[in-house]
Regions:
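Alpha-helical transmembrane segments and their lipid-water interface positions
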Residues: 30, 103-104, 254
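A short secondary-structure junction motif
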Residues: 28-32, 114, 118, 204, ...
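Alpha-helical transmembrane segments of integral membrane proteins
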Residues: 47-84, 129-266
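An internal, D/E-rich "acidic patch" concept
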Residues: 13-70
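Hydrophobic alpha-helical transmembrane segments of membrane transport/permease proteins
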Residues: 1-22, 115-135
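Cytoplasmic-entry segments and transmembrane alpha-helices of multi-pass inner-membrane transporters
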Residues: 71-108, 193
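Short, hydrophobic secondary-structure boundary micro-motifs
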Residues: 19, 34-37, 103-104, 119-121, ...
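Membrane-water interface segments at transmembrane-helix boundaries in multipass membrane proteins
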Residues: 90-152
Length: 266
């Protein structure tokens, strides 16, 4: 019992609830998240070691989601009701129906087990040159593919609305070329499309948690889930709260952008 009492005393768990809470809050706002129950290391240091990896994965995934969604949505709108449109819509719907973890396992089975061309785990330190870059390919694909379905459909529908607008019909009547007409339609729909992609920031980042665990990717998501399983409460609390702050901040920025881009939202 003496050892237990000493541990409780060292952790400050014998103080009152409000004393513990405000002490933790004061440390949290200064970047001191405490010490891991499992490893004994500083939680801030554990997060710092993995934050860059998660940011690299997020940036790669988000940029590719935006590019592929816009390109496929534009292609689908240009060839409306033709084979390309039907194929893109069917493929997008199929991908949107599959959960992230299932797609991740399929990618591992194909590229790591059957073809043996990409690693399914083993990443320690990432880099865009050298060996580290190959470890990010499969996790990025596993995040991208499920997001394409709804995104491609949104871009397609929004571009079709623009192409059916009165000013586009006027441009057709005046004999403007197809290229210029599509540029006008893209410009008209750009505010809604950019705002829509801005709202995806939080979902893409938070959705990478499971993917990081499946691929043993050394990021914040894997750190958080491992901490939850091991009941390492300081690490779990810090990573979850940081993710929540990021989600709120990302949504706030998206709304501010929408207000600045379109005064009708005021």
């Amino acid at each position: 019992m003496a050892i237990k009492e000493q541990i409780l005393e060292n952790l400050g768990l014998k103080d009152g609830f409000f004393v513990q809470y405000f002490r933790w809050l004061a440390h949290f706002v200064t970047g001191d998240f405490g010490t891991s129950f499992v490893s004994g290391a500083s939680v801030s240091l554990l997060i710092k070691e993995r934050l860059l990896n998660s940011l690299i994965l997020f940036v790669c995934s988000f940029v590719l989601i935006a590019l592929f969604s816009f390109f496929l949505g534009l292609l689908s709108a240009i060839y409306k009701n033709k084979f390309a449109d039907i194929f893109i819509n069917f493929s997008s719907f199929l991908l949107a129906s599959l959960p992230h973890f299932y797609i991740a396992l399929v990618l591992i089975a194909i590229f790591s087990v059957y073809l043996n061309v990409l690693p399914s785990s083993g990443a320690n330190e990432l880099g865009f040159s050298g060996v580290g870059a190959k470890f990010i390919i499969l996790p990025t694909l596993a995040i991208i593919l499920p997001h394409l379905g709804a995104n491609v459909k949104f871009v397609r529908d929004r571009l079709n609305q623009s192409l059916n607008a009165d000013f586009i019909q006027t441009a057709h009547a005046r004999g403007l070329g197809r290229g210029k007409i599509y540029l006008f339609a893209i410009k008209h729909a750009s505010t809604d499309i950019v705002y829509y992609f801005a709202t995806l920031v939080a979902g893409v980042f938070a959705g990478s948690y499971v993917i990081e665990s499946i691929f043993s990717f050394p990021g914040i998501g894997k750190l958080s889930l491992d901490a939850v399983i091991a009941k390492d409460y300081p690490v779990a609390l810090a990573t979850i709260l940081l993710t929540a702050v990021f989600v709120v901040f990302a949504n706030l920025l998206a709304k501010i952008f929408a207000i600045l881009a379109d005064k009708r939202n005021l």
